[in-house]
Amino acid sequence: MIKRSSNLENQVIQSENFSKKSLENHVFNSCSFNSCDFSESLLRNAHFGTCIFTNCNLSLPKLDGCRFQEVRFVDCKIVGAEFFKCEKTFFSPKFENCLLHYCNFSDLNMKKVSFSGSKLKECHFTNTNLISADFGEVDLSGTVFHNCDLSLADFASAVRYDIDPQTNKIKKARFSLPEAVGLLRGFGVTIV
């Protein structure tokens, strides 16, 4: 079990239940979290550096001031996470085959982020820097992009996205048909 105000390094944490528990001000460096439950956990001002979360549940975590620096999430369920409340300076996550539902990534610098193989359902991106982001094999059902920089982002194998080129920068972003037709919705165009 992790003690109060812990500073852990190079640890493998397996099947731990942190649900509704506080990890406030804890520091984790080069740690692996496998099959852990962080639902509704308090991660205020916690620091995760070069950590990997595999098959973890992060539903409704409290992320005020939390730092995710060079962190990978693999096969995780992340619901209702307000990532915009995280420490913005060092925010550098990578998501692989994750379920991200109702998450908010507004006002973040997510340049070169990868969401590879993930499902982003009704997530929110406003004023987000997503230059060179990888949305490979990503389902973006109901996800909103507003005033984002999507330049050089790769949506070529993404599905169910609805991006308005009038409110987002999409210069040199990659799209493919038939999904790219969604780029015309904001213009009131009818395609037959």
Give, region by region, the residue ranges found by the protein language model.
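Tandem repeat scaffolds
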Residues: 1-192
